[in-house]
Amino acid sequence: MYFVYILKCKDGSLYTGITTNVERRFKEHKDGKGGAYTRAKKAIKIIYSEQYKNRSKASKREAEIKKLRRAEKYALIKH
């Protein structure tokens, strides 16, 4: 299984990523072992995730979410 996830960062920004284990990946982000963005912005909370059976579908969804504006991401999270 693959997951698309959104993290909230200390400065209020949002980070979208893909993984097979959301909790492990969040810990990596918090420990400074994630992407450069979360090392700089400090991930503080998992605020959303979606599950997919394969990497291809998850990657497509990740790309869709990354194109959304901030308000659209928050609307997605609320549903």
Regions found by a protein language model. Name each.
Residues 1-52, 56-66, 70-79:
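GIY-YIG nuclease catalytic motif and its immediate N-terminal context
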